[in-house]
Amino acid sequence: MCTEDVIKRTKAVQKWRVYMVKGLYTAYTGMINEQNRLDILSNNLANADTNGYKKEGATNQTFADELAIKIKDTSYYGMPQKLGTMSMGVHIGETYTDYSQGNFRVTDNSTDFALDGDGFFAIAYTDKAGNTSVKYSRDGAFVVNTAGYLVTKDGDYVLNQNGAMNADAGARIQVDPNLPITVDEKGNIFQNNQQVGTIGVVDIEDYNYLAKYGENMYDLVNGGVRQASTAKVTQGCIESSNINVVSEMVNMITISRAFQAGQKVINAVDETLDKAVNQVGRV
């Protein structure tokens, strides 16, 4: 074999190896992407029975195309030789929350509430360090404590309308714990035919300013604007999560297959590279 043929063959092998390594990296990023999607999906399934939980999802985004050149090849007027462009795989583009309304579950409990429409209950949440801040939730499973305050199952205070609109954690709702309560669709609370308070319901102008906190609560980040809600309060019901378990299971199977396909690609490229190094290189 003449020197010119050897040079041509060597260059061809170099170009081929670049695309083989690219195949490895593309498969690797694809597997990482599918693993992240699986983590999100698993969290959705784990919270399928969580009151007011909102489904999360993720979008895929490709890395920017990179210009590939031959390493140390400046034979063309001293300029690097181009191999073309290549995409270096995919990654999670954005994790988003689906705020669509879940189904209502009838409980006939007078302190259980669901919101029909856009909006959130306002909760004065106290963390383990004793710090209190206003959170927003669609979970209306409340109780009346011994002091007569309307609270969540964890004991955090439910805010009235003034507290909800102004993020006033001290604007609590207090009723007579010994009397039954009735609540209309505007959230007005009645005992003995007299209004004793109003459940605070507020909406957010742009949901992109909501950050998930825990399983079914949200923080309003800087720049977020509260606004009046048109949601109707339904007594004796709780909003379930908006998770479709069957659909999520189908997606899990699809993701698992995509992950396995990435494994097969890596194995195939690994075997091919092994032959290139140990067999083709000897020729």
Predicted regions located by residue number:
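Amphipathic alpha-helical polymerization modules
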Residues: 2-283
